[in-house]
């Protein structure tokens, strides 16, 4: 898909430039760049000298994803861009009702269909609901609140936990069977996207 590839390229170049200018601590940009690529591709692997104070930014990049080297990781940058653009146009249309605002991708003749926007919004909503469910279940499984929240994000995004998220001390071996089962189930849901599961259930369970 040409439009998505173009926007992903701009997104990636922008991130590389921002990280090089603002986060190049102690001239260890190679480690930061590796963690950056690992986060936006949802691989999750990092080097030992990755700055630990950037873990929140890396988690945000994991959530956004971008389908770099992966087909279904993250919420997808293009989805979030479409929703933000639609929201801005809706606000502008109310403040300037005489102007016509078209939901269209720049540098392309492709319009953003309203039906696609509904799907994107539903995907984000389902992710937020799933995140809080996993977070709650991990918390009652005696995992510290902050660690449970990070682990919930990485589970839904199918990302390996590592030191750049400050989760290197978590041992899956010591987790209970129920906790492991919760992680496995929501990793599968995160991989195939819950919206797809709901559509399939509706197709097979509510036949005419």
Whereabouts are the PLM-identified features?
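Membrane-proximal intracellular helices of multi-pass ion channels
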Residues: 1-208
């Amino acid at each position: 898909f040409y439009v998505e590839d173009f926007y992903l390229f701009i997104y990636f170049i922008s991130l590389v430039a921002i990280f090089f200018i603002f986060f190049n601590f102690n001239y260890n940009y190679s480690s930061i760049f590796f963690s950056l690529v690992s986060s936006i591709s949802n691989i999750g692997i990092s080097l030992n000298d990755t700055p630990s104070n950037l873990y929140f930014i890396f988690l945000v990049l994991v959530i956004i994803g971008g389908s770099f080297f992966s087909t279904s990781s993250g919420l997808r940058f293009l989805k979030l861009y479409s929703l933000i653009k639609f929201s801005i146009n809706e606000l502008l249309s109310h403040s300037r009702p005489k102007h016509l605002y078209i939901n269209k991708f720049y540098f392309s003749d492709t319009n953003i269909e309203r039906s696609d926007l509904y799907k994107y919004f539903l995907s984000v909503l389902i992710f937020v609901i799933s995140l809080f469910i996993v977070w709650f279940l991990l918390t009652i499984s005696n995992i510290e609140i902050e660690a449970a929240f990070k682990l919930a994000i990485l589970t839904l995004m199918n990302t390996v936990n590592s030191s750049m998220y400050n989760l290197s001390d978590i041992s899956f071996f010591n987790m209970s069977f129920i906790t492991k089962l919760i992680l496995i189930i929501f990793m599968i849901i995160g991989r195939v996207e819950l919206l797809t599961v709901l559509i399939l259930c509706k197709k097979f369970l509510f036949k005419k």
